[in-house]
Amino acid sequence: MHTLSLPALGSSDAEANPALNVVIAYEDLETGKRAMKTYDYLVEHLGDQCLFANQMWKFDVLAVPKLKDIAAKDAATADIIIVSAHEGNELPEEVKGWVDLWLKYKTRASALVGLFGAESVDSPVRDYLASVAKRAKIEFFCQPGLWPGRTDKRDSLNQTLSVLASVMQEDHEVLHWGINE
């Protein structure tokens, strides 16, 4: 499914508040809801500074070549890319193909976010997404699982999202810097 939600823009709104584009790739309804909670958190914490847009792509539609290409172009122009999946051994091949495609398009993203349902310390999906972020030279944020020494998962997730919001705020403050202002 491909959705776009943009608030009504006046020219002064667009100049005062830059757009923050978020692409979400998700496995199913449950993981889509998890990703939307993260998106809503960002809107809640940065919504007064940015205009938000999102595109959502379900994993299974990424198997269709034309749709995969559109989704890859969306990801390449996004500021944040969120991948939300159930924990498993590997991401589906159609998702890896989509990732490879948006990497070829030279992403402008600032961050890649991984959201998973598992509670394990070891995660092949987490490792894969971390390597993708490294190749793309972007920040990687991951929902914490059972990390050694961590007991409260909710506080840890809120801390991770808070850091993500701070990084995005810093990246967009740089856009306002210059002699033309």
Give the positions of each predicted feature.
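Short N-terminal or domain-adjacent regulatory/targeting segments
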Residues: M1-A19, E94-W98, R154-D155, M168-E173
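Extreme N-terminal leader/targeting regions
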Residues: M1-D60, I179-E181
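Short acidic, S/G/P-rich loop/turn micro-motifs used as interaction or catalytic elements
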Residues: L29-T31, V61-V64, V83-P92, A118-V121
